[in-house]
From Swiss-Prot:
Family from the record: Belongs to the ATG12 family.
GO biological process, one term: autophagy of mitochondrion
Taxonomic placement: Eukaryota, Fungi, Dikarya, Ascomycota, Saccharomycotina
Numbered residues of crosslink Glycyl lysine isopeptide (Gly-Lys) (interchain with K-147 in ATG5): 153
Membrane topology recorded in Swiss-Prot or TrEMBL: Peripheral membrane protein
Primary subcellular site in the record, as a coarse category: membrane
Species for this entry: Debaryomyces hansenii (strain ATCC 36239 / CBS 767 / BCRC 21394 / JCM 1990 / NBRC 0083 / IGC 2968)
Region described as Disordered: spans on this chain: 1-26
InterPro entries referenced in this protein's UniProt entry, alphabetically: Atg12, Ubiquitin-like_domsf
Keywords for the protein's UniProt record, in alphabetical order: Autophagy, Isopeptide bond, Membrane, Protein transport, Transport, Ubl conjugation pathway
Coiled-coil ranges per UniProt: none
Pfam family, one: APG12
Name of this chain's protein: Ubiquitin-like protein ATG12
Biological role: Ubiquitin-like protein involved in cytoplasm to vacuole transport (Cvt), autophagy vesicles formation, mitophagy, and nucleophagy. Conjugation with ATG5 through a ubiquitin-like conjugating system involving also ATG7 as an E1-like activating enzyme and ATG10 as an E2-like conjugating enzyme, is essential for its function. The ATG12-ATG5 conjugate functions as an E3-like enzyme which is required for lipidation of ATG8 and ATG8 association to the vesicle membranes.
Taxonomy, superkingdom: Eukaryota
Amino acid sequence: MSMIQSDQDESSDTSDASEVSDTLEDKVIEDEKIETRIPLSTSIVLEKLPDQKQVQLSRITNESGIFKVTIRFQPIGSTPSINPRVFKISSNQSISTISKFLIKRLKIKSNLIYLYIQNSFQPNPDEKLGDLYHLFKTNNELIINYCHSIAFG
């Protein structure tokens, strides 16, 4: 983005305050240019990496793909259990998807169920299952406990 500025007329020796303030404002605007973010896939530097570094980079980018997550559901307290207890779901799904699934499967009329990861904490509804799986898997399964009322406070 280029700024168009007019040259001052050399024949006029007087300059008023409005012209000075205009040039100062132009300078401030030019100094505050927003940097554009370029995705790594279009980076010229990444294309010129040595072969070994290219292989390492491709491994990292390929690992972030979508995969199936194994989930084991365990009820807490008097909440009924579902059969089967183990399901597979895409890693890009969120916890809210699991919540909706359990509400339908258990036929809960209040549309409210509390989910916990390994009886420890309640995840955010927008948390991705793939991220939770990588952090909290046990025996290659993500254990999700569910309950009708708040179990841990």
